[in-house]
A protein has these predicted regions:
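Residue-level recognition of tetratricopeptide repeat
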Residues: 3, 40-42, 114, 147-148, ...
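Alpha-helical junction/boundary sensor with strong preference for TPR arrays
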Residues: 25, 62-63, 136
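Alpha-helical adaptor scaffolds
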Residues: 63-101
Length: 158
């Protein structure tokens, strides 16, 4: 339910869903996943102090098992200020059929774009969202989120 609320712009409701999921998290992968979405939901809801607290379980010694969760973990370190934007952003995939590279690019680029958005840089955010929307990983949450945000930023866009 959290992602459904999130992509509909119901950020407080999304945060509550992710807060509940985080309370039930039984391993690092679940903590990493839920913490990321809780953080961005709270930031989008304007609750910066709460968002910072949402990442309290993300410490330098937290490790992921599932490879795709490394993308979220690196984003969380970026949100905490431990990584720079340049360090966290992956290169645009050279091969559009490289699904792992596309997933990494879309996930992290959307996350950094979202960070620009809630820090007042809508133009920078839109540039990053457009890069993601040009890709092929339409089933990645970063791709979905980029299309949603581009529509929110410019409702005349298809």
């Amino acid at each position: 339910m959290g992602l459904a609320h999130y992509f509909q712009g119901q950020f407080a409701e999304a945060a509550e869903s992710f807060r509940q999921a985080l309370a039930l998290a039984q391993n690092n992968d679940s903590v990493i996943d839920c913490s990321n979405w809780l953080y961005v939901s709270l930031r989008r809801a304007g609750k910066t102090a709460e968002a910072t607290q949402a990442l309290r379980r993300i410490t330098p010694d937290v490790k992921n098992k599932e490879p795709h969760l490394l993308f979220y973990l690196r984003l969380e370190h970026f949100y905490q200020g431990a990584l720079t934007e340049q360090a966290v952003l992956p290169p645009k995939p050279a091969d559009p059929n490289d699904t792992e590279a596309e997933l990494a690019f879309d996930t992290v680029t959307y996350g950094v774009g979202n960070w620009h958005l809630y820090n007042g840089d809508a133009k920078g955010a839109a540039e990053l969202f457009r890069q993601v929307a040009k890709g092929n990983a339409w089933n990645a949450w970063g791709f979905v989120g980029s299309e949603v945000e581009l529509k929110r930023l410019d409702p005349t866009q298809r």
